Amino acid sequence: MKVESPLETTIKRAKLYQDAGADGLFVTGVSDNATIKEIALSTTLPLNVVGTAKLSSIKSLSESGVKRISMAVFLYRATYNQIENILKEVITEQSLEPLF
């Protein structure tokens, strides 16, 4: 969904949520720390974002005002990729050793 002024719209919505008594703000689609910082400074609500390859530094996100980082499906994907690699090794080596 395209929004004409995404940052301004997000800040306006954050204020509405805050005024309505929300306990937190979950913002998706942000891709840089500067934008996150602007959003965090615009509200007293704890800010939650989804970590991505571009937003992978917990320290940077925290310094930008993020209070909670969601991993979405990324943790599961990483786990399944690791399992797949181990199973390929088991099949190739015909040994259970890669499990240990």
Regions found by a protein language model. Give the residues of each.
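Flexible, glycine/charged-enriched surface loops at secondary-structure junctions
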Residues: Q94-F100
